[in-house]
């Protein structure tokens, strides 16, 4: 990793500066980031739409329900379930984007043929940490069981328990937020090699970075609030454009099936970029990257001064 060859300036930044920089990075590399994000998002988006399709028949569910006759409750159930799935799936779905961010920011030479090699090498650890422990795969299994059990389509207890589990997993993710970067970019192993007992492992690395993330928790709370606001804003803007262009001002199936999930994934893309920048900022604070660059610049300046001809 060459710290003197980066797409952004290596410097310690405040939380407001990181929020601003995340938007700048998206603006500058929008095409590339969107391409790599779609590779992971499309399979999950299609799977979510298929599994949640039984919950989208609001009128039918309200007619069959004995507890409520309002279809708005069932619409809320669908929207909330979709949001929970995207939240739990985002770290795994956006892993390709995380790799692209690392290669882009640090100007690494890579080809489109082998850019997924780090994920394939770490597939076991990624599946265990991001797929199982972070809740993406269990949430999909619960959703699939719900989709195959008609009685659960009208039961709000499943979504209540899924919400509680999602909150717990979100808190757990806040303790160790940089799992995608550690696994994909640093290629850290889950267990140490018997031949190298002192090698860095995933648990050691997360503990070490946890001590250095002074402002990460504050940024995490801000990110959650901004994500909710951004998703709502994107949906309202899309609804307004549809109303102006085609004269449809009602919240129809296209909002539930296309625009709302797209807004969620767009917000997930932004949070992935922000998390990566916080990760870089944490390493700058912990490893003194900015000091290393200053020492390199001073050494280069001294070398140029010593090599200059004596004009006296």
Question: What are these model-predicted stretches?
Answer:
Residues 1-312:
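Hydrophobic alpha-helical membrane segments
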